[in-house]
Amino acid sequence: MGEMENIIYSIYHPTILVGFAIGILSLLAIGFQKNDLHALILTDVVECAMLIIIAGVGTDLAEALILPGLVVSLAELLAVSEVLITRKYLKSKRPKPKSYKLFEEFKLPLYTGELKYDIHMEILKTSPKFLAIILIVYGAILSGFTGGAVIATGLLFYALSQRVIGVEISEELKTMWEGISGLSGIAWALWIFGFIGFFVFPDKWLLCLLMAGLGLVIKVGSKLGLIGYIGEVR
């Protein structure tokens, strides 16, 4: 047991130095980088370097911080990648490839030669809203990182289902969705304050827990939900 502790202590300082070195070098490389794709990859490298520093602490709290950090960084990477792909597509002005949608069996050829939906099922319009509301409410009850992921799943399911059945999302909902995504920075600050409050005000642990949980819900839910919003705009 003593030898294992000595090994852990011996690699702590090199781990912290390696993490800081990778982060600083990646930030310098981003400053000199002109390619958007390379800058995106380097940004993800910086996030991995910060996770290395957190992992070097080797405590249960550090372990709890690694998973939310990985998922939030992945959500940001996917969202920015969607923006870059869309911008590249608009610049290239290439013909849009044919997209295949669900419910192809409900499409019947008309005299004009076009394929249009020739069926009206109420469940196709109401069930996505019902399932999305259930997921959002359940995610709000869970709170924290897991709750944010469940809420994001409900938002993505609603956006994708509306696109599949050919129904456009209302402008009011798009505006509200964009506003929630804009609260990402505020949610992150709320989570930081709640996290610090555990140590500064231990007697207020319940309030700090609710603050941290609410911050993670908004942060993760808005980031993952942004993917469906970008796809709808595109």
Curated annotation (Swiss-Prot):
The keyword Transmembrane helix applies. It is found in: Cell membrane. GO terms for cellular component: plasma membrane. It comes from Methanocaldococcus jannaschii (strain ATCC 43067 / DSM 2661 / JAL-1 / JCM 10045 / NBRC 100440) (Methanococcus jannaschii). The keyword Transferase does not apply. Keywords: Cell membrane, Membrane, Transmembrane, Transmembrane helix. Pfam families: DUF2105. This is Uncharacterized protein MJ0523. The lineage of its organism: Archaea, Methanobacteriati, Methanobacteriota, Methanomada group, Methanococci. InterPro entries: DUF2105_membrane, Prd_NiFe_hyd_3_EhaG. It is a multi-pass membrane protein. The chain crosses the membrane at residues 11-31, 52-72, 131-151, 182-202, 207-227. It comes from the Archaea. Its main location: membrane.
